[in-house]
């Protein structure tokens, strides 16, 4: 009998699926799991001339709210802080327009699970 995937492994698999999907849509990866004192950015990508900060959310069940529902005001503030620090450290991206997207995956960890890509998920 196989053990269930750990939340960390499930999250990494969701990030990989999101990355592959977004690259298939023409986005280019700038950074993955970029960490700073203010938090972490799952994916930082370039969409034409726009820097995109992508939060990947995975939920097995919607019992406590779905993946999209898990981006509350506190989480948004942490993402904005991390994005600000990224743009300060990676100053060459500082003059590019930017946006915050969310990729939400819900359901079993098998390939082909439904993926939702919400562009401009919130304003800062």
Swiss-Prot record:
InterPro entries: Restrct_endonuc-II-like, tRNA_endonuc-like_dom_sf, UPF0102_YraN-like. Gene3D superfamilies: 3.40.1350.10. Pfam families: UPF0102 (PF02021). Belongs to the UPF0102 family. NCBIfam families: PRK12497.1-3 (NF009150), YraN family protein (TIGR00252). This is UPF0102 protein PP_1324. PANTHER family: UPF0102 PROTEIN YRAN. It comes from Pseudomonas putida (strain ATCC 47054 / DSM 6125 / CFBP 8728 / NCIMB 11950 / KT2440). It comes from the Bacteria. GO terms for molecular function: nucleic acid binding.
